[in-house]
């Protein structure tokens, strides 16, 4: 008996339509299905679920290392930084990295 993979990652969002646009247009996800309060997209081979929840606190955790990491081709690293900046994505400072680590871009979605 084993867990074979992660089926999907679900994000709570305050506005489903603007979040769909962010994940489609900025992160280049493919929209699979969209309902009244839920949408599913794929980014690479990962399913991303967006679940609209308007009345929940969103700024309670401001210094957590909890995150999702996407993989990109190394040669596209600077292109992605430029793309995120051009689209006014909130790019975070990140954390100190060991020189042996791969490069990372830390950013938030529309809900932080």
For every predicted segment, state its role.
Residues 1-17, 68:
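N-terminal beta-strand motif that seeds the catalytic metal site of vicinal oxygen chelate
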Residues 49-51, 106:
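Conserved beta-strand in the GNAT
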């Amino acid at each position: 008996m084993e867990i074979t993979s992660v089926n999907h990652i679900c994000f709570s969002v305050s506005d489903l339509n603007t979040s769909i646009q962010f994940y489609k247009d900025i992160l280049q996800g493919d929209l699979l299905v969209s309902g009244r309060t839920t949408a599913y997209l794929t980014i690479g081979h990962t399913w991303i679920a967006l679940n609209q929840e308007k009345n929940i606190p969103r700024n309670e955790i401001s210094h957590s290392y909890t995150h999702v990491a996407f993989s990109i081709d190394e040669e596209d690293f600077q292109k992605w930084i430029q793309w995120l900046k051009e689209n006014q994505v909130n790019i975070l400072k990140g954390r100190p990295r060991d020189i042996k680590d791969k490069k990372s871009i830390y950013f938030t979605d529309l809900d932080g």
